[in-house]
Amino acid sequence: MKSIYAFEKSVHPFSDVMGQTVSVNPLNKKWTDLFVDYPILKETLDGLDNDGKGHCVISREMIFREKDCRRKAILTLLWGFPRGYRNSKTHKNAVKSVVEIAEENNDKNLTPEMFKFMIGKAGVGLSTLSKILYFFEYKVNGNPAL
């Protein structure tokens, strides 16, 4: 079976993929309920541009450029789940876990042990983890995580 990288030249990149945005309602109860435990969440939402309808706007470029790991983790979660998770316990666990993962110091080369550690965190499934790996620019066997 060919590697996905064998098709790299066949795939045409989208124009301005970094400019893609999502809107997040900062008053969504699933987010506001976590402000007390995670002030970084409120600080992050308060610092975002507003779309004129009261929603915060997050772009891919903004997430990639963010240098603060905790804030980047929150932006990644907001990007991937702008309406929050269905289950409030999972939602709270995911916020806690992505912040913990972001604070881990490593060389961004994903090892099987790191993968097990990350996927073992409460509230972190493959969907959440894939976003963390992508926005934090992890590599798998020397290749960028998709």
Predicted segments, located by residue:
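An N-terminal alpha-helical hairpin/helix-loop-helix interaction module that forms a charged
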Residues: 1-119, 138-146
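Active-site acidic-Proline motif in GNAT/NAT acetyltransferases
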Residues: 122
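Short hydrophobic alpha-helical segments that form membrane-spanning helices or hydrophobic packing faces
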Residues: 129-135
